[in-house]
């Protein structure tokens, strides 16, 4: 059997076979792994949130038991998810001066805010759908007159950032905090 040394015809033939026969299934498998990982991350964040709720419970009960005495001091405790600084973190990486769903300083910010407002942070599926929608908006131009035109994520990045860094940010959920 001949070795497929880099730069040889056999090497490039093997590369073409991989592209034709295997790449799409590898891509589908990688996307499935990514989706499962983000769902697991959401569950782990939910566990942290539930821990906060458990820790707040005795204090909340105390406040409820002494609400008459504390009426001059309105205290409310609850644990929930919030978007933490997502606009700054996202647009630190995205160039709003190039074609894409987030093109335009005000328009891009408004589009991201509208997407965030649709999310019910109490529901894991809603958070997962947000992540998928954000990815979709990077791949397809969702502005009204662009009819979902395909966009390259790399061209939407600011200098110094990679697609991997952007996806680590999006799928890492660092912007959702309990």
Predicted segment positions?
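Extended, charged coiled-coil "arm/hinge" scaffolds of SMC/Rad50-like chromosome-maintenance ATPases
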Residues: 1-177
């Amino acid at each position: 059997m001949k070795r497929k040394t880099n730069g040889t015809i056999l090497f490039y033939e093997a590369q073409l076979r991989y592209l034709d026969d295997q790449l799409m299934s590898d891509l589908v498998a990688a996307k499935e792994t990514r989706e499962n990982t983000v769902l697991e991350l959401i569950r782990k964040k939910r566990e942290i949130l539930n821990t906060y709720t458990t820790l707040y419970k005795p204090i909340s009960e105390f406040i409820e038991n002494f609400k008459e005495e504390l009426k001059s001091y309105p205290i409310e405790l609850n644990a929930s998810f919030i978007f933490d600084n997502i606009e700054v973190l996202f647009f630190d990486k995205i160039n709003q001066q190039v074609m894409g769903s987030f093109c335009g300083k005000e328009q891009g910010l408004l589009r991201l805010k509208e997407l965030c407002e649709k999310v019910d942070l109490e529901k894991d599926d809603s958070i997962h759908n947000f992540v998928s929608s954000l990815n979709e908006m990077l791949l397809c131009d969702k502005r009204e007159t662009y009819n979902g035109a395909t966009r390259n994520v790399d061209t939407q990045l600011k200098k110094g950032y990679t697609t991997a860094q952007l996806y680590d940010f999006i799928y890492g959920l660092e912007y959702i905090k309990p």
